[in-house]
Amino acid sequence: MIGKQATLRDIVLEELVQPIDLHCHEELPDLPEDIEASVVEEEPAYTPYKIIVLCGGCEVRLKLYVWATDAGIRNLQDCLLGDVRLLCPTCREDIRNGGR
């Protein structure tokens, strides 16, 4: 190398590149034939949630307490933001007695 910086011509590889055998000849342990039976499914984790929504009739504030999984609470959220409306007891009675 001449100078302070190395050039491509100055770099000399000392080790030769050799292919490596990726087949290491390891043996896998015997697996059960029915893998599905041996796998134990974990029960999904339930979390308590407090949901505050407005009544679909009079718009009074309603509180709803639920235990739900992550997927379950998302499904409930989609329903409540979509076409499902909750009713308070007063509006329920009004509808039951022929009102609205």
UniProtKB/Swiss-Prot annotation:
SUPFAM superfamilies: E7 C-terminal domain-like (SSF161234). One of its GO terms (biological process) is symbiont-mediated suppression of host innate immune response. A zinc finger (unnamed) spans 55-91. It is found in: Host cytoplasm; Host nucleus. Highly phosphorylated. One of its GO terms (molecular function) is DNA-binding transcription factor activity. The E7 terminal domain is an intrinsically disordered domain, whose flexibility and conformational transitions confer target adaptability to the oncoprotein. It allows adaptation to a variety of protein targets and exposes the PEST degradation sequence that regulates its turnover in the cell. This is Protein E7.
